[in-house]
Swiss-Prot record:
Species, as recorded: Danio rerio (Zebrafish)
Entry keywords, A to Z: Cytoplasm, Cytoskeleton, Repeat, WD repeat
Protein name according to UniProt: Integrator complex assembly factor WDR73
Phylogenetic classification of the source organism: Eukaryota, Metazoa, Chordata, Craniata, Vertebrata
SUPFAM superfamilies hit by this protein: WD40 repeat-like
Residues in WD repeats: 84-123, 276-316, 337-376
Chief location bin: cytoplasm
MF (Gene Ontology): protein-macromolecule adaptor activity
Length: 376
């Protein structure tokens, strides 16, 4: 998509009313991981080079200045800690309550990292966990809710296991032989976890039970890739509180809850570019604070936000309530031979309408959007 100067100027003028806050940053190398370290900092890591930088970035102080923004000069992200991985970083997660990161790349290992305190600016690798399966490259990772730090991880269904970080001891394995690739995985509560494969199937497991429940799609197109997002409250035991969204590379979307994973309570089709099925940055995410809002990216240089409140069992093609086009309007995108594609986006854990997004051109944005209906 070629962006003209006039179109870019028009977007800039529109953005003055479309955002409460909009801060743009340029990374030296693009990232496809954005991991929250709390309310005011994130971790990012490169994926394009043999040696990849891992950074902890403080969000712009101006974002938190409220009515005193005019008195705050800090508009940029600030590097707080940094380190280097000897391989591209495919997945990165933070262990809650610690200064520990876990990453995976193109080797069949997990790397454990320590983020220094106030007396050090270094992110240092402290141990490597060797995975037995030769196919365990680029493992998806999610933190466990156990007393000692653990991670659930795997690149294909049969490889998924729960591992204790301090010892490398395997605490649980998924009792299913399947070579299907993992699209994502996440804990619902302290014991129950959900896995989505790239063919759209869901698996529900429990660390207290060696078996898993398998929920394949009724109709599956082998040419499609699927991504998923889970919205849950670990303090809630009611299955209806956990919403699952699945999105295919053709734009087909399924919404389910844990009471009946076989039958989605809603399915719809969103508009996506025809060439979008070739990329692997597809991302769907529920808003943690706003009820029934979810976001989609990875098809082009845009992040779209949808309100699912009025979606029915067979909804017609819904329109986003907001679209962030900043990455395709950036100077880097205009000067590039290929259009920028959003590689990752993430909602702020406590600010209802604040998101971060990153793109293939190295751009990193934090933005607080305005809902033209509710914010009038």
């Amino acid at each position: 998509m070629d962006i003209s100067s006039d179109e870019s100027d028009d977007w800039f003028m529109e953005s003055l009313n479309a955002y409460r806050d909009l801060h743009l940053f340029q990374l030296e190398h693009p990232t496809k991981v954005i991991e929250w370290m709390g309310d005011k900092s994130i971790c990012v890591a490169g994926y394009t080079g043999a040696r990849s930088e891992i950074l902890e970035l403080l969000l712009p102080l101006k974002l938190y200045a409220g009515d005193n923004q005019g008195l705050c000069a800090e508009r940029d992200f600030k590097v707080k800690h940094g380190g280097f991985s000897e391989e591209p970083v495919e997945c990165l997660i933070h262990i809650p309550g610690t200064r520990c990161l876990v990453t995976s790349g193109n080797s069949n290992t997990l790397q454990i990292w320590d983020i220094g305190g106030d007396d050090s600016d270094v992110i240092k690798m402290t141990r490597v966990i060797n995975l037995k399966s030769p196919s365990a490259k680029g493992s998806k990772i999610t933190p466990g809710f156990t007393d000692s730090p653990t991670v659930l991880h795997g690149s294909c269904i049969s490889d998924i296991q729960l591992t204790e970080i301090a010892t490398g001891r395997v605490l649980h394995t998924v009792g299913k032989e399947s070579s299907d690739s993992v699209s994502g995985l996440q804990f619902v509560n302290a014991f129950v976890f959900l896995i989505c494969s790239t063919n759209g199937a869901l698996l529900l497991g429990d660390t207290r039970d060696p078996s898993t429940c398998h929920y394949p799609l009724e109709e599956s197109n082998s040419g499609l890739r699927w991504s998923f997002g889970l919205r849950s409250d670990s303090s809630q035991s009611e299955p209806s509180c956990c919403k699952v969204a699945r999105l295919s590379s053709s734009g087909h979307m399924l919404l389910s809850d844990l009471r009946d994973l076989k039958s989605p309570f809603c399915q719809t089709q969103i508009k996506v570019p025809q060439s979008a099925s070739k990329n692997h940055f597809m991302n769907i995410s529920w808003a943690p604070v706003l009820d029934k809002c979810l976001s989609v990216s990875g098809f082009d240089g845009t992040v779209h936000i949808y309100n699912t409140n009025n979606w029915s069992t067979e909804s017609s093609s819904p329109q986003p309530i907001f679209s962030h086009r900043g990455h395709e309007m950036s100077q880097e995108a205009k000067s590039s031979t290929s259009p920028a594609v959003v590689t990752a986006h993430s909602w702020h854990p406590s600010r209802p309408k604040t998101l971060l997004s990153a793109a293939t051109d190295g751009s990193l944005h934090v933005w607080d959007w305005v809902d033209k209906i509710t914010d009038r």
